[in-house]
Amino acid sequence: MGEYAAIEKEAKLFTELCVHNDAIDPNLFDEFGVKRGLRDKDGNGVLAGITNISRIDAFEMRDGVKTPCDGKLWYRGYNVYDLIRGLRGKRYGFEEVAYLLLLGDLPNEQQLHEFTDCLTKCRALPSNFVRDVIMKAPSKDLMNSLTRSVLTLASYDDSVGDNSLQTQMEQCIKLISVFPMLAVYGYHAYNYYLNDGSMYIHRPRPELSAAENLLQMLRPDQQYTPLEAHVLDIALLLHMEHGGGNNSTFTTRVVTSSGADTYSVIAAALSSLKGPKHGGANIKVMEMMDDIRAHVSDVTDEDEMRAYIGKIVDKEAFDHKGLVYGMGHAVDSLSDPRAVVFKSFVQQLAMAKGRKADFDFYNTVERLAPQVIAEKRHIYKGVSTNVDFYSGFVYNMLGIPVELYTPMFAVARVVGWSAHRMEELVNVDKIIRPAYKSVMATRDYLPMENRG
């Protein structure tokens, strides 16, 4: 295919026309009661559906008053904290929690063995897929690579047009199984062809968990420590699911409701997750932390740290958007339970890696940023760290390249997407179609010669 035609001049003009004609008076949104972002002024989401997969508790009723509380995240009725505590030092949790989210119950030993064996059997790509699809079209944007791979897999599936629930379940399980390979192999192709790096393709090993296989496929020597694998496993578990209203999961529901096939649905969810306001947040955290280090002469000086964080909030520093990335969440209020649980594992890994000073730096920002935000902004609820604040730091300590940060999120969240797709198919047979209020003025048709 040839190069795209250069239309920079025309595009500039078209953009100016678009901005002029598309601008809507912001007051109209309030006048018509529009919930922008499908959220009210307090940040609460518009009720769009019912789910039995997960729940986030950010508020509780006290004397009849809705009051912010420390967050709790429930997977199929189980507190995520209890799920992780039950795994501590015993086994990896990705497969067990995937079973729980997808099928609704915690597996017994035999059920877990059968499910894990099923994932292992599906952990294979079609013949020459890596060569013909991943290697021949490497991309620096690994989310694009991942999305393309998912859509291409549909052409290898003879049952793609079969709408039975059993076929949808089979396709979901297969995608959950191969996502680690698609992500890691996509990175190796990029690193070799576009980054002048080395390339090595390690096959997944059947006796290893998802977290272990991710590390051994990514690293040239295939070596990792139990702590590294365990912390990555916890990271995957905490990113698997976060309710039906997050952007990519709601996208899953919307596209599923149209009757689209599994591959198209998951590709749409990936496209949503790719956005920096969603799956790319941990990259922004890392960039922000690097910026703070570069502009604060002594990161142990809390007055200097507080002053620079204030500049970020005032849009005078970093990307001038006024956001302290990794702080706050659309649903959680006083705390993100994922961040609370994750922090102890982050600390363990930091100590093992000789990164205590870096952990202390993150801890300082975590403590000071909410104070600065509260001083400078009118906020409707508490501000606390979310799971994105620490996940990029963990990936960095594990030697995972930044290009893989969002794909790692996808490796975990495809489990939640699959669970929500199945729940939508089981319970709903109506396309999602919200309303938009038109505020355009009607005009009389103008013949060509009268248009000026």
Give residue spans per PLM region:
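Non-transmembrane, aqueous-exposed alpha-helical and coiled segments at domain scale
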Residues: 1-452
